[in-house]
Amino acid sequence: MTRFVLFLSCFFLIGMVVECKDGYLVGDDGCKMHCFTRPGHYCASECSRVKGKDGYCYAWLACYCYNMPNWAPIWNSATNRCRGRK
C-alpha cells in the first residue's frame, strides 16, 4: 500500500513539473501554419512532429496544437513577426 501511495505522489509531482502548452503552430516565416487546402490529418501530423499530443484545423484555418513542449514555437499576437511585422 505504501508503494502505491509513493507511486501516486511521484506521478502527481511529475505532472506538476512537466508543463505543456497549447496554441497555433508557427511556420518558419513566423506565420500560423495554414491548413485550408491540406488533408484532414495534416495538423495532427504537424503537431506530433514537434512532440505535440494532438492538433486540428481551427476556424481561423490554422493548425492548433495541444500539449506541446515548452520549446516548441507557438503563435503569439504580442510577438507576431508574420510578413515582416515586429
UniProtKB/Swiss-Prot annotation:
It is found in: Secreted. The keyword Disulfide bond applies. Has the structural arrangement of an alpha-helix connected to antiparallel beta-sheets by disulfide bonds (CS-alpha/beta). Keywords: Amidation, Disulfide bond, Ion channel impairing toxin, Neurotoxin, Secreted, Signal, Toxin, Voltage-gated sodium channel impairing toxin. One of its GO terms (molecular function) is sodium channel inhibitor activity. Residues 1-20 form the signal peptide. Belongs to the long (4 C-C) scorpion toxin superfamily. Sodium channel inhibitor family. Beta subfamily. The keyword Signal applies. This is Toxin Td8. Beta toxins bind voltage-independently at site-4 of sodium channels (Nav) and shift the voltage of activation toward more negative potentials thereby affecting sodium channel activation and promoting spontaneous and repetitive firing. It comes from the Eukaryota. The modification Arginine amide is found at R83. Expressed by the venom gland. One of its GO terms (cellular component) is extracellular region. Disulfide bonds join C31-C82, C35-C57, C43-C63, C47-C65. Residues 21-83 form the LCN-type CS-alpha/beta domain. Its main location: secreted. One of its GO terms (biological process) is defense response.
